[in-house]
Amino acid sequence: MSIALAFFILVLLGFSWASPSALDDTFNVSRSVGLISSSNLESCQSSPLEVGNIYNSTSASEILSTLDAKYITIIGVIGSSNSSIQDLIDSVGNSNNAASSNPTSTVTEYVDRVQTVTEYVTLSCGQAFTSTVDISSSTSSSVINSPTGTAVSSQISTLSMSPSSTPVFSPSASVSSKVASSVSYVSSEPSDSSSSTNTVILTTSVNSPAVSSSETLTSVSITSTESAYTSSSVDIAASTTASSTLPVSTSEATVSFSTDIPATPSTLSSPASSSSSYLVETSSTLTDSVFTTVTATSDSSVITYTLINSVTSSSETTNLPSSSSSLVTIGESSFPSSLLSLLTQSFSTVRSTSSSSTDQLTSASPISSSVISPSVSSPTSSILTNSGSIKSGDHQIVTTSFVQTTTHGSQVETLTYVTTLTETILTTTYDSHTFLTTITPSPSNSISYTNNTFIPSSSIKSSIVYSVTPTSAENYTSSEAFSTSSSLVVIPPVNSSLVTSSTSFTKFSSLSSSQLSTENFTSASSSLSLTNAKSSLSTPSTTIPTSNSSVSLQTSSSLIISSPIISSSLTATSTSTPALTHSITPSNTSYTSSLIPSSSTDYSSSLITVCSNVTSEISSTSLASLISTLTSQQISSNKSSEFVGQTTTEYTTSGSVGFTTTLATQSGSVPGTVLVDVPTPSWITETVTSGSVGFTTTIATPIGTTAGTVLVDIPTPSWVTETVTSGSIGFTTTIATPIGSTAGTVLVDVPTPSWVTETVTSGSVGFTTTIATPIGSTAGTVLVDIPTPSWVTETVTSGSVGFTTTIATPVGTTAGTVLVDIPTPSWVTETVTSGSVGFTTTIATPVGTTAGTVVVDVPTPSWVTETVTSGSVGFTTTIATPIGSTAGTVLVDIPTPSWVTETVTSGSVGFTTTIATPVGTTAGTVLVDIPTPSWVTETVTSGSVGFTTTIATPIGTTAGTVLVDIPTPSWVTETVTSGSVGFTTTIATPVGTTAGTVLVDIPTPSWVTETVTSGSVGFTTTIATPIGTTAGTVLVDIPQQHATTTTTTTFDGFSGYTSSYTGSITETIVIGTPHHSVVDVS
């Protein structure tokens, strides 16, 4: 009777990377599949297994309907029923997409996206087990199917099983992720046929930036007899127990447990004054995983280690003085006194059960002492790393690093390829048979170089060979070599065997299922077809007669195999006698397989093709299961991370062409090594090391683009980064700041010829600002690497070309540093410091223009500014007055050749007035920097040329200063002081005329004037008489009869407002004070 096993992998693809709380980069899968004994097979011979039964039940269909149809695909099937496979396809398609007219298209269309992994395993007599992990929602569920079709599901904290039948065995499956819950099933065969006990260890682990948590492990034991169903749960961390008993008539039994999620610290640490517990995974046998709790309790003098076996409940305790550095002996092993060293050096899997950490550590297996030399065609600068001693009966790992260095001018690029090869030799005794499993990888043809140029491995001639050779009437030996990172596996006849192996291997890339079309078994009497080209899946027959048969495989015209090859072989012995030879030669599309039977025994065989790239931890108890696991347990992922020894790797895929960059970080260190698996011509990387601690950031840029991806290999708690994208071409600059410091390093991912940067350090604390300017443009982006609370910046854009100036002011100071991102030839700046407190104002003027923008770096409470724009060309003048003083500094943004200014200081208090005259004109604008309540001014415009005279009188005085904005050759003034009180009168006469204008700077109550208009031409005479006297002075200033027009423009810092006053000779013109404008620096 043949064995029927069915593995279905339903893959839900598509990662989301839209926010910082995106998925963690770790996704490890390990699985152990048990063997159905021959006695159990006898009990099932009367009722052949039907794969379709799993899906034909109502409840199972309901469960499948909850899965989104567009994420489902079937990669491989092994079965004994001709009709059940099509039933399976119909059931899955109909359950997930009722509206689909072609279910087979539905289940095979979306093979390239992975986010949910569902595994179906057919047990004896039709039982099925399903384990589902949804990475995106951090949930997991389990389903156990009985032969009657009853299906029960669970979500993380609940395990449901049907007591109506006793499983012969349960597969041990473990799916773990830092963002998804992990459920581990450890099974044991019943001692008799009337009862069965299944022990389940459920692990909840969530490690996300948005969620703080730890792992909680609960052991659930489920015992089923003919009359009762008993379940008990033990919380390993809390040492609490709960149990319940249900009659067999109960349709469902549910065992629930709570998950305790305490706060999550950032790193593992040695035990302090409190107790710390870790769960370590060992193997007491070759088939069962044993979780052992290691607890370390320490005080000032003693460290106590306690190991508790979760299966046997046995414990061992060892005390050690805390000051001792010797090893601790527990059982047959010696451990160092450091708990962290104990775990990482002695156990394969370490998980925390306390609040100390949720990190999983995977220790490196012993290293092989044999030397693997680089191939003769490898570059001269090759480095061979990781060599050591081999431990009997264990793994031997050899890691080879090929380093290629290329020089382009002054730039040196380094490309590193790392290949990890694992050998495993295990011997297992089962009943009276001895089985030997050997996994031997080979680095040959892994990487080929010609003149230091990487050659894709698709051009390397290689083969996959699967051979079965009879060794005697009762045994045969099989071997398989995995090459080109994909597997084409033929399952040999296995009637009753047990082969155990455990290995860890990496497949860097492989064929996608869309590149495979049809694989055929052909013989004289029957044929088997398996199509993976998004069309159909059918199995007309699985019986191959005793005569020789041939196998052919048709593929697409091109096989894309662009990654290094890792080859390994499997050797096992079993009791079957036929011999099967299968060979593949990638150089052509012809594949042949021949069967050399030694008896007339019928058997079932299927062809499975799986394409993926992931690292898997595999444990198997049969040759068929081992091969199936190696092929079906592959998971395609755009972004994944695994633990290889004590090295953490992170994969990032960038751009539409799918280039991939890998960062490898040794445990216990912060800097990592960047491993780029794309040849130099396709991927440019630049690495910058910052700070004394040697933090490293690497930027990878695909050839032909100007923007790259910044890869930072330091965790968030240690390294703060800020990325700014500038301009329409998307150049990207990243600033990395070590925690605890205020200054960072700017990392620019574009070569110097394309991106010009200028860095300015300001102040004694060393704050740093960098301006990045794309080549060919005059405006850049200012990047400030200090958080807002420590550094205040204000950016002003001036003119139509968009020149930009930024002022950075450290918090707690009033003066800042002006950072200008345009080179000196394009941007003229002038900075004036005013007052004893060192307030600073800067004017920036684009080259080729006469007007600039005044940038003031002091907040409103400390600095009052008033800006006036004069003339049609928009000249701008700004007066800055420190708060608490009456005198300010006039800042003029036009060079001397374009703008003539004259400043007069009046009185003992130092009030200042400035007149600004554009070059080429005779009239200017008087700018007064004191508000009206402190400084009284009167301005008179005289004559057709618009000459202007202004008198400024300090408050509290009766005499003022006449400020004339025309040089002496154009404007004659005469000032007369009258009386003992020092009243002052000034007459202003335009050059070339005999009459002037009387300017009186004393209000009417102090100075009496009388004006008489004489004659037909309207000449005007004014007599001024000081108060208290009877005689006055006649001041005559009659201009020609022309109307006067005065224009005032007020500039509020952003817009100019202009008003004009036109009147007759005798009309009084009132000139309003320009709007008061304040520059608010925020």
UniProtKB/Swiss-Prot annotation:
The entry's keywords: Conjugation, Glycoprotein, Repeat, Signal
Gene Ontology CC terms, in alphabetical order: cytoplasm; external side of fungal-type cell wall
Cellular compartment(s): Cell surface
One of the protein's GO biological processes: conjugation with cellular fusion
Family in the record: Belongs to the mam3/map4 family.
Region (11 X 36 AA approximate tandem repeats): 720-1043
Glycosylation: residue positions: 28, 56, 82, 451, 475, 495, 520, 548, 588, 613, 638
Function: M cell-type specific protein involved in agglutination during conjugation.
This protein's name: M cell-type agglutination protein mam3
Signal peptide: 1-18
Region Disordered, residue ranges: 353-374
Chief site of localization: other
Ranges for the Sequence repeats: 646-681, 682-717, 718-753, 754-789, 790-825, 826-861, 862-897, 898-933, 934-969, 970-1005, 1006-1041
